[in-house]
Amino acid sequence: MPAAAQPSWWRLELEPPGELEESLLWRLESLGVHRLAVRFRPEAPEQRTLQAWLPEVDWPEPERVALAEALAQMAEPFGVALPSLRWELQPEEDWALSWKRHWQPDPVGQRLLILPAWLQVPAEHAERLALLIDPGSAFGTGSHPTTRLCLEALEKRSLTGSRVADLGCGSGILGIASLVLGAREVLASDTDSLAVRATAENAALNQAGAHLQVQLGSADVLQQLLAGAPADLLLCNILAPVLTALTPAFSELLTARGEGLLSGLLVDQAPALTAHLEAHGWRVTTEAEQGRWALLAIQRA
């Protein structure tokens, strides 16, 4: 009796516009695509390739066409065209190797290390603080410049004993990093149920579940989690239009002397967002930039 044929996988590739990368990852996850990676060379971090692996049996041509249409519709509000999608069939063993091979230990800043959960800390990074992440969650794995900007900003701050609010938590990596760096407690929320699940799972991987609470919702839910005791630090790594819409809620989430770290915005969006924040009573500084992306720090004026 002949051996059963090995299943094959579609490998999907595209070069995402920077402002679309995180949203594409989220949309693919919501459409049932759970094996994702973002490839880039350290010397050229802006040249990025998004890759996804899909079981051939589950994704015949009509399903792949529908997927492309859904991604194109998602790109329309951003005013950019979705790049062409490239499809290639891979045998089972090639897929298994390809997916995990693209995730390697990733040092960030001076002290942090993003570590895929199945790997050990390399000897050369033994002194770094490891953040265990399941890249299959597709949310904020740390490769995106805005996530790295936030992580680098966190390690510059004294977080010992602080209370942190993470609005739009994605994978939970920023909240987990806050705990690793000394925060006492993290309260987190996201409007995507997949992100809430990813945050909870990644917190468990890092044995941080007892100090990180996450719920489905936006600023109102986060305010409820804070239970009348505002945070010392607010993290919000979301697109600029969402930051604009959420600005009125920031004063309810932070103590009088608290600080917010806002990213997810492009450098050329920073002036308008800064003016908007200042009009709502915030003192704003552009703390850092990486490529086309910016990080703003806010405190009450």
UniProtKB/Swiss-Prot annotation:
InterPro entries linked to this entry: Ribosomal_L11_MeTrfase_PrmA (IPR050078), Ribosomal_PrmA_MeTrfase (IPR004498), SAM-dependent_MTases_sf (IPR029063)
Main location: cytoplasm
GO BP annotation list: methylation
CDD domains cross-referenced by the UniProt entry: AdoMet_MTases (cd02440)
Subcellular location: Cytoplasm
Keyword Cytoplasm: yes
Catalytic activity: L-lysyl-[protein] + 3 S-adenosyl-L-methionine = N(6),N(6),N(6)-trimethyl-L-lysyl-[protein] + 3 S-adenosyl-L-homocysteine + 3 H(+)
EC assignment: 2.1.1.-
UniProt entry tagged with the keyword DNA repair: no
Gene3D superfamilies: Vaccinia Virus protein VP39
Domain of life where this protein originates: Bacteria
Keywords assigned: Cytoplasm, Methyltransferase, S-adenosyl-L-methionine, Transferase
Similarity-based family: Belongs to the methyltransferase superfamily. PrmA family.
Function description: Methylates ribosomal protein L11.
Protein name listed in UniProt: Ribosomal protein L11 methyltransferase
Organism: Synechococcus sp. (strain RCC307)
